[in-house]
Design a protein with these regions (language model features):
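Catalytic zinc-binding patch centered on the HExxH motif and its immediate surroundings
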Residues: 1-28
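Short glycine/proline-enriched coil/turn segments at helix->beta-strand junctions
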Residues: 2, 52-55
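Short pre-active-site segment immediately N-terminal to the catalytic Zn-binding motif
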Residues: 21-41, 50
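Walker B catalytic acidic pair
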Residues: 45
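Post-HExxH zinc-binding segment in Zn-dependent metallohydrolases
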Residues: 54-81
Length: 81
């Protein structure tokens, strides 16, 4: 599998937390999300790229489950300045 590129951009017009572009292997994620929501969105969109045949309901359930597990075990985004 080729690398997935992640691009942060405000997605207010799209009314979305994130978007996955399967053909280009690009995830767009709205950076205005708080910690756990950001993590869940990142996982959710990556699942869309990894498993394009998976239904939205399944992607949502599985991404929520994985995000909850990682969050419970203190996985966080570190911002380097």
């Amino acid at each position: 599998m080729s690398k997935v590129k992640v691009v942060e951009r405000k997605l207010g017009r799209e009314k979305a937390y994130g978007q996955a572009h399967q053909a280009d292997k690009i995830i767009e994620i709205d950076p205005r999300q708080a910690g756990k929501r950001y993590l869940r969105t990142m996982i959710h969109e990556h699942f869309h790229i990894l498993f394009p045949e998976m239904s939205e309901t399944e992607v949502d359930k599985k991404s929520a489950s994985l995000a909850n597990l990682l969050w419970k075990h203190n996985y966080r985004k570190v911002i380097n300045k």
